């Protein structure tokens, strides 16, 4: 697709008759599948049956998407109150990661209780997978030309030594923008490497998951400050408030669980 003289990628991957298949959905699906593969592989190593994470994903992903959409709609209610037919339209994006995370955690707790397994063990195993899915999923925002930052010049983007296809896709309505999707994606990929390395340290159970929350939240806080489409509550950027909250809560949980003797088991223990 061309916009002016700048070639750009089409957000529609293929057309199946009258039905367009968007890159956004394909990329999100790819992130889920790769994350599932990573979790099932590690789960089997730690004695978790392969179908456990398959079953969890089949339940958790739809619920996470529902919560992600609800979260987004709630903070954009002024628009959706006037356009209720758009509430269920997620083809163009509009999924808030923090909402999805809330839905996934609630589902994980209930699932673990029903299966009679430790939620913290499942959460630790899943942590790198979740972050991998988020790292990949940000490229869906890239295809949709959303979740970008403030205006910049082409020279600025070229100075980052980015490939032309990224620079061109950041050209929206005659203006170049910060590729904040890329900053967050790279931060998340680095986090995946960190979490995989920390598996070998044999942390106390639950602390790998809290490390994920802290790592993601720190990166999201700074990237959010560059974005122009932040969900707001008065003068506050909701994602930044949530990020600070998750860091504080994670640190408190780590300290309290250790002091109360609730973190005696290690990651590698069955």
Curated annotation (Swiss-Prot):
Subcellular location: Cell membrane
PROSITE patterns: LGT
Binding locations of a 1,2-diacyl-sn-glycero-3-phospho-(1'-sn-glycerol): 138
Main location as per UniProt: membrane
MF terms (GO), sorted A to Z: phosphatidylglycerol-prolipoprotein diacylglyceryl transferase activity
Membrane-topology annotation of the record: Multi-pass membrane protein
Domain of life of the organism encoding this protein: Bacteria
UniProt keyword list: Cell membrane, Membrane, Transferase, Transmembrane, Transmembrane helix
The UniProt record lists the keyword Cell membrane: yes
CC annotations in GO: plasma membrane
Pathway: Protein modification; lipoprotein biosynthesis (diacylglyceryl transfer)
Family per record: Belongs to the Lgt family.
Entry function: Catalyzes the transfer of the diacylglyceryl group from phosphatidylglycerol to the sulfhydryl group of the N-terminal cysteine of a prolipoprotein, the first step in the formation of mature lipoproteins.
Protein name (Swiss-Prot/TrEMBL): Phosphatidylglycerol--prolipoprotein diacylglyceryl transferase
């Amino acid at each position: 697709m061309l916009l002016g003289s700048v070639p750009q990628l089409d957000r529609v991957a293929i057309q199946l008759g009258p039905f367009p298949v968007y890159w956004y959905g394909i990329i999100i699906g790819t992130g889920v599948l790769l994350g599932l593969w990573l979790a099932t592989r590690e789960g089997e190593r730690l004695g978790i049956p392969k179908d456990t994470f398959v079953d969890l994903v089949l339940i958790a992903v739809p619920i996470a998407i529902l919560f992600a959409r609800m979260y987004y709609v709630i903070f954009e209610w002024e628009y959706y109150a006037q356009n209720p037919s758009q509430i269920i339209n997620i083809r163009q994006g509009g999924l808030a990661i923090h909402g999805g995370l809330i839905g996934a955690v609630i589902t994980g707790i209930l699932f673990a209780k029903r299966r009679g397994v430790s939620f913290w063990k499942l959460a630790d195993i899943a942590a790198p997978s979740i972050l991998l899915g988020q790292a990949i999923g940000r490229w869906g925002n890239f295809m949709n030309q959303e979740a970008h930052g403030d205006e910049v010049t082409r020279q600025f983007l070229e100075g980052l030594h980015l490939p032309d296809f990224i620079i061109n896709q950041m050209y929206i309505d005659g203006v170049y923008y910060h590729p904040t999707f890329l900053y967050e994606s790279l931060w998340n990929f680095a986090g995946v490497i960190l979490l995989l390395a920390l598996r070998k340290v044999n942390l106390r159970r639950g602390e790998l998951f809290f490390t994920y929350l802290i790592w993601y939240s720190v990166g999201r806080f700074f990237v959010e400050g560059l974005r122009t489409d932040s969900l707001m509550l008065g003068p506050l950027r909701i994602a930044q408030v949530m990020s600070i909250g998750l860091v504080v809560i994670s640190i408190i949980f780590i300290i309290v669980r250790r002091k109360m003797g609730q973190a005696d088991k290690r990651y590698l223990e069955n």
